[in-house]
Amino acid sequence: MSRSGVAVADESLTAFNDLKLGKKYKFILFGLNDAKTEIVVKETSTDPSYDAFLEKLPENDCLYAIYDFEYEINGNEGKRSKIVFFTWSPDTAPVRSKMVYASSKDALRRALNGVSTDVQGTDFSEVSYDSVLERVSRGAGSH
């Protein structure tokens, strides 16, 4: 349960585990149910295109997302994969929505074991492929 009293629906955890363990999805979009009492799955996708993911982010509302981010380091070490947690809260979203999503984030984030990187986005430049690549690859290759 979060500070806002919002709970994480079981379906949200099931979908996350399907992405993490079964590689069933490329990304999952989460949002609040209509009563604003539970974090539920809004959509899942197997589309490998990062642009397809970005197209799903609403211009005027908040959501959470999990993305199985694949990338290569220096081109010769093979592909790597990191699970990225997004909090999408555009400046144009209603203030109430931003407040509820901000205060409910920790409940979802704590429930999702195995996330390697968190990205907070208020505009599309903050969630661009290059911006996220920079975040997930920090320290990679230096081990």
From Swiss-Prot:
Sites of Phosphoserine modification: 4
Post-translational modification comment from the UniProt entry: The N-terminus is blocked.
Molecular function terms from GO: actin filament binding
Amino-acid biosynthesis in keyword set: no
Entry keyword annotation includes ATP-binding: no
Subcellular location: Cytoplasm; Cytoplasm, Cytoskeleton; Nucleus matrix
GO biological process terms, semicolon-separated: actin filament depolymerization; actin filament organization; actin filament severing; endocytosis; Golgi to plasma membrane protein transport
Cross-referenced Pfam families: Cofilin_ADF
GO CC terms, sorted: actin cortical patch; actin cytoskeleton; cytoplasm; nuclear matrix; plasma membrane
Domain ADF-H: 5-137
Keywords for the protein's UniProt record, in alphabetical order: Actin-binding, Cytoplasm, Cytoskeleton, Nucleus, Phosphoprotein
Family according to the record: Belongs to the actin-binding proteins ADF family.
Function description: Controls reversibly actin polymerization and depolymerization in a pH-sensitive manner. It has the ability to bind G- and F-actin in a 1:1 ratio of cofilin to actin. Binding to F-actin is regulated by tropomyosin. It is the major component of intranuclear and cytoplasmic actin rods. Required for accumulation of actin at the cell division site via depolymerizing actin at the cell ends. In association with myosin II has a role in the assembly of the contractile ring via severing actin filaments. Involved in the maintenance of the contractile ring once formed.
Further details from the record: Present with 19600 molecules/cell in log phase SD medium.
Assembly: Interacts with actin and AIP1 in a ternary complex.
Name assigned to this protein: Cofilin
Organism: Saccharomyces cerevisiae (strain ATCC 204508 / S288c) (Baker's yeast)
Gene behind this protein: COF1
